[in-house]
Structures are given as structure tokens and as C-alpha cells.
Amino acid sequence: MSLKGRHLIDPNQLSLAELDNIITLGLEIYRNPNHYREICKGKILGTLFYEPSTRTRLSFESAMLRMGGTVLGFSDANTSSAKKGESIADTIRVLDDYADLLVMRHPREGAPLLASQYATVPIVNGGDGGHQHPTQTLTDLITIHHNKGKIENLKVAFCGDLLFGRTVHSLLKTLSRFPNMEFVFISPSELKIPKHLKDEVIKSNNVEIVETTFLEKHMSEIDILYMTRIQKERFFNEEEYVKLKDSYILDLQKLRNAKEDLLIMHPLPRVNEIHPEVDTDTRAKYFEQAKLGVYVRMALMALQLGVIESC
């Protein structure tokens, strides 16, 4: 099914075949970027970032510029009419006429879905509260495929803030749809994966899940370690954050029993949960992950805008 004109609010809107198409095209663009330098000439991307972002916003902007398009938008709600009380619906009704595609990040869960109800151009969810982050999921999938050559028969460990981590929630729900996946959840008891999400994944996909508070317990078994930071901005209590912020710090000592082809990933930004000494380990792929995010977003937007039909 064509992605032309379609919104992307939740990665589960995409079939496995569509996910494969986006990833395949993203890797093709990554290998041959010059072939795609002007495919979006005359196209405008609108960025609506009501919440701080470095990688997601700049990755989208870089992606559009690398395809010959242009970008307009805001990176702080305080510099937009939202500060004056303008509704999301009214903002979308206006910007819908200014751009060919809109990407929105918002602290409120469901805001991009609401926006999509008023837009005639494609809306992409750039992250909504602790809910979903579909293009980070695409970034994660292209990184896994690029390094493992497959997305199946893998044991994936998620570590850190599994309660509020929208990148974890999006990726978990999507990976659980692929064949023969196993998951390990590593977190403090205060930041465990939401029960409804765990139950949904188990019930709908019959996957094997293990929960633990110990980072090293399953290190020798896992194929992918997905680290996340403890998110200070999600806490209402400073004391609780201070108590939990150093729960997990990955260093070379903790990797001593890990597989030689372990894939260490992180959606970034990193605080202190991965020691800098790990950066030079060949298994550390989080900076490559951020780089590949540009190319998978190029692929997504090209397909949504209809400048490419499929790979």
C-alpha cells in the first residue's frame, strides 16, 4: 500500500512490508545519497516542536534539505502562538497551507493524532509525551537491520526508564510483531514497563518476556542492549529523580561477558548511563544510530510526499 499522503502517528500503522520498504529505501539512500539530492525540490517541511529536541528536529531538517527541500517552523512553543493560547487545531489549519508535510513533537499524549484530524498534508509524530515516537522506531529498526542483517530471532534487552520511555514503548510494540523475538526488561521497580503494554505484547504476539533489576544478569544471552536515560523532565519529585538517576551505568567491565556481536543502542541524549569508555567499543552503535536516522527519515518523507512510490 502506498504511503503517499498518509500520516504516521503510531509505528503500528505500518505493516511489516511497509516497514521493510522504508528501511530498504533508507539504506539505499544511505549508500547512494547523491541520487536523491533534488527529489524534494520545491517541497516544504513544517516543524512544530512544542518540546525540546536536538536529534529528531535537526534530523528531519537535515533529511529534507538533503533532498533539495526547504524547512520552516518553530523549536520552542514559547516562540509560537501557542504561548498566546492558540489551539493545536488552529495552528494546524494555518500551517497546513504553508507546508507539504508537518512533523510535530508535543508533551501531551495524543496531540499529533489530534493534529492529523485537521490536516490535509501528512502529519508525522515526532514524539508525544511518554506515548509513541515512530521515527525513532524506524531509526532503531534500520540500525538493527544494517548491523544484524535481519529483524527476527533476536533477544533484546531494554534498560533504564521503561515507564516513561516513549522510544522503548514504540520499539517494543513494533519488534514484538517480528518472528521469534525475546525481551528482557531491566529497570528499577519504580520505572518498570507499564503493565498494560507488557500484557498487550504478550497477549497479541505470544513473546517471551523476562523482568529484572540487574543489568548484567542476562548480558551473555542478549543480541541487542537498548540503553535509555532516566528522564528528569518526567519526574514531579526532584528527590525521586536523584534517587534513581544512577541506577544503571554501562561500562566495559559490565560488558565482559557480552557477545562479541552485541549491538549497543541508545536513542540519545545520553547523560551518564553509558560510560564514555564504551564509545570506542566496536559494539557501540548509538552514534551510527543517530546518523542512520537522517536516511530513514528521508525515505519516509519521500514516500509520504509521493516523490518515490516504493523501493
UniProtKB/Swiss-Prot annotation:
Sections of the chain in a coiled coil: none
Annotated L-aspartate binding sites: K84, R166, R229
Residues reported in the UniProt entry to bind carbamoyl phosphate: R55, T56, R105, H133, Q136, L268, P269
GO molecular function list: amino acid binding; aspartate carbamoyltransferase activity
UniProt-listed Enzyme Commission number(s): 2.1.3.2
Pfam families on file: OTCace, OTCace_N
Recorded metabolic or biological pathway in which this protein acts: Pyrimidine metabolism; UMP biosynthesis via de novo pathway; (S)-dihydroorotate from bicarbonate: step 2/3
Protein name: Aspartate carbamoyltransferase catalytic subunit
Lineage: Bacteria, Bacillati, Bacillota, Clostridia, Peptostreptococcales
